[in-house]
Amino acid sequence: MATDGSDPIPPHKTFDTILVLDFGSQYTHLITRRLRELNVYSEMLPCNTKLADLPFTPKGIILSGGPYSVYEEGAPHVDHAVFDLGVPILGICYGLQEMAWHFGKNAGVAAGEKREYGHANLKVESHGGHMDELFKDVGNELEVWMSHGDKLSNMPENFTTVATTTNAPFAGIAHKEKKYYGIQFHPEVTHTKMGKTVLKNFAVDICQSTTDWTMGKFVDQEITRIRKLVGEKGQVIGAVSGGVDSTVAAKLMKEAIGDRFHAVMVDNGVLRLNEAKQVKETLEKGLGINLTVIDASDMFLDRLKGITDNPEQKRKVIGNTFIEIFQEKAKEIAAAAKNSSNAGEIEWLLQGTLYPDVIESLSFKGPSQTIKTHHNVGGLPANMNLKLIEPLRELFKDEVRALGVELGIPEDLVWRHPFPGPGIAIRILGEVTREQVRIAREADYIFIEEIKAAGLYRNISQAFAALLPVKAVGVMGDKRVHDQVIALRAVETTDFMTADWYPFDGEFLKRVSRRIVNEVNGVCRVVYDITSKPPGTIEME
């Protein structure tokens, strides 16, 4: 919860935890998601995590898939201490091959004669005892999803085959004595029928994990953690944007420490149309949270001048300026509170960081690369005088929404689309100027207004208009113009780790395009982004 390591009771100390070690698969985060859907708490760490550095003992370990070949030089390998921990282990795809590689001797992993991508028919073999537990209640055959080039060519010592496919004679293996299992398919993807049952068998039946990870339980535990961390007189200043993440975080903090929580919104000049006014009304009237709005738009926009092609620099400038303003406001609030019932030091800064933010900001030395610096995770100055408190840091987006409902937050707030901390600045590709902000802001307002009017808002996970760094020729009012291009983006997703573009019908897009071109001065062309994530990210920068 706190990034300085002072959190007295992290979730893995409270809930039984399945540890997922990531070898770089595009599906790894889904393993954690599926386990949490089963009410089993799970955390993901890099595959090269040293067990000696692990602050908890997991109930079980899952080795993820990955884009590597275990036999190649430089391929990532797990800490050998994993196999001395005495807990059940499940290897998925590359994880199976890594397990076989570890046990060595007669085991072999080789490039398959035929790569296997897509659906496959898995046949389950019965051997009795613990070896049958992984495939309990799935039947003798099931449809699974394969995504591999290499495969196991020889069985490791003391293992036996528990499942096969036409192209993978060792599609499922199990240790004869220990609760070690390997599967070549991906149970975490929805294409695998009964995949969640396989994960349940491992986590709940084999690992004996409790199924008590619920938002109702999380609220009680988190409020206790916050109170213990902050203390009886400690105060927290909250970074509030009006999005679902910061709203839920603010409500949780209010429930935990009452008036010792100070909600502050910084108008950075790159908010949505009328955002500051609407957020203030929403939080104060709807949730009983007093909100201080600081208009720092001139400072932010002045500091963003001249940044044309470096989105990371934009994020860092916004992050540095944001913290600078918050530190000054914290001093003012602390001074005003000295002679009140709230007397105490403001030591903490609340942020609505989520688990996908943490995952995307990790820089693994082995299998993974940094995708981008998230505004709630990176880009913060090293000399900041406030410690971060991030009560949502272990949650996925859908869990945050469920938490919001648990806290009694109105549905229209719970289901509000996310809005990034750097705001419209990362939806303007190129230099951020007041004129560019105006154009992007007005286009975005029209797009969202039309989505709501069409009854599509809840069907779409995130939508916005972005301003591209190019101009196009058009004809308006019988005259040639050379004006801006707006790109519309809308996606569907459950956890924001992967996303598909939303398939609007042509009439809807025609209507939005016509309105933007006619109502937003300076725009002559509108395009629709149909890039999924991956390969793209949801935001433009």
Swiss-Prot record:
XMP binds at residues 315, 478, 533, 539. One of its GO terms (cellular component) is cytosol. It catalyses: XMP + L-glutamine + ATP + H2O = GMP + L-glutamate + AMP + diphosphate + 2 H(+). The gene is GUA1. Its main location: cytoplasm. This is GMP synthase [glutamine-hydrolyzing]. Homodimer. The active site is at 93 (nucleophile), 186, 188. Signal peptide: none annotated. It is found in: Cytoplasm, Cytosol. The keyword Cytoplasm applies. Its cofactor is Mg(2+). Its EC number is 6.3.5.2. PROSITE patterns: GATASE_TYPE_1, GMPS_ATP_PPASE. Pathway: Purine metabolism; GMP biosynthesis; GMP from XMP (L-Gln route): step 1/1.
